[in-house]
Amino acid sequence: MADGVSPAMESLDILNVLRLLPHRYPFLLVDRIVEIDGDNSAIGIKNVTVNEPHFMGHFPERPVMPGVLIIEAMAQTAGAICIQHAKQIKPSVVYFLTIENAKFRKPVVPGDRMEIHVKKVKQRGMIWKFACEAIVDGGKVAEAMISALLSAEEPE
């Protein structure tokens, strides 16, 4: 690779997301990954619809996507980076470890197309830390720092 040239960006449709992530309905919260740059960054898409089960109770008269699910969408997008990388080192699982500085700025509602931007900011061994943002219509709706552990062993 020539100096100053970054590797080609990848894009993953839903079928490839399903091959990559272990999550399934109703907990798969990434519909597409429009950009994944090696083990550095990714942009995921979550198309929010009123048909999702959490909207039956959160809240029936004014549906709002729960903040914890926005964080989970961030974790799944970051997890895609980890799992892409893990293919080379063969860990069996990626664990979500921490959430720091989570902020929710605006509700995410049915009909929104949420972009999830994640960027690896630190790596120490098998623990990776990511800066994450959720964006709707060009505006930041949530942000958090999260960390994950790539593990070669299943828990007991």
Swiss-Prot record:
Top-level division of the source organism's lineage: Bacteria
Keyword Cytoplasm (UniProt): yes
Main location, first listed in the record: cytoplasm
Family matches, as Gene3D superfamilies: Hotdog Thioesterase
Subcellular location: Cytoplasm
Short name of any one Pfam family annotated for the protein: FabA
Biological role stated in the UniProt entry: Involved in unsaturated fatty acids biosynthesis. Catalyzes the dehydration of short chain beta-hydroxyacyl-ACPs and long chain saturated and unsaturated beta-hydroxyacyl-ACPs.
Protein name: 3-hydroxyacyl-[acyl-carrier-protein] dehydratase FabZ
Gene of this entry: fabZ
